C-alpha cells in the first residue's frame, strides 16, 4: 500500500506492507526561513495499531538555526528501548546521545550526553529526563529531570546543574519548578549561580520568575589591570519573558586596581519589559572608593534610566575629600550635574 501526503509544511511518501512501514520521504518545515527537516526510515508496526511501532530505524537531516553545518540524527529502537544520536557533520562528538526506555506509563532518558561547540563558548554535559503519564498528552504529563553543564576557561573547569520538575509543560498554563546551581568559567571570570525559579504560562509565551534566594555572583579579571573582587546580582522577584525583564534589578560591585585603588558601587532600580534595546530600566546608583596616587577617597551618587537604546543620567554628584600632588592640596573638589 502506497502512502502519500502533501501539506503546507509536511510532505510524506511511504509504503506499508503488512507490519512493515518504509518511509522514503518525510520533509517537515520546522523553522521559518530554514530548509526542511528530512527523514527516512523503516518501522515495524504493532499488530493492533494502538501504540508506537514495535521497532525501527530512522535517519534525519536538519539545519541548526544560525549555524552553517548540517546535522544528522539517527534513531534506533527495539521493543521498549532505543537510542537517539545527533551529529554535526563538522564535529566528531555527538550533539546529543540519548538512551531511552518507554512503557505505557513512563518515558525515561538515562545518562544522556550533550555538547554544544558553537558560539565561541563550548558547553557539554549529561541529561536525565523522566516523563510520567506521557500517553495522556503534554497537558497531563508530569516532567522531571536533571541537566548538567560543563564549561572551561582560563580559570579552570566549571560545573552547573539544572534540576527541573516535577511539573508540567502546557500550551496554556505550564507549572515547572527549576533550580540552577553551580559555576561557569570563561576566560578569567568565574560565575556562581543559585537560581530557584518557576516556569509558568504558555509554551509560546512563557514566564520565568525567580524565587527568594536567587543570586548570581562573579569574580575574576575583566581587563589586565582591573580585578573584580565580587559582583552580586540579587534576582528574587525578577521575571523574564519574551518582552524583557520585569522587577527590581540590582547590582553590587567590589573591585580594585593595583595602582589606583579599590571601590564599591551599588545600582538599584526597577525594570519594565527591559532589554538592551527596548523597554525601560530606571535606577539610582551610589558608591565610594580610594584614589591612591593622590591620597584621596571619593564618592558618587545619582539617578538615571535606560530607555530603549538611550542611557540618560538625570542626577550626578561626585567628588574627593582632597587631592594631594606633591606639596599641593585641593580640598573637597566636587562635580554636580546641572541638567540631564
Located regions from the model:
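Acidic, low-complexity segments
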Residues: 66, 92-93
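Extended lipid/amphipathic-ligand handling interfaces
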Residues: 1, 9-19, 27-30, 37-51, ...
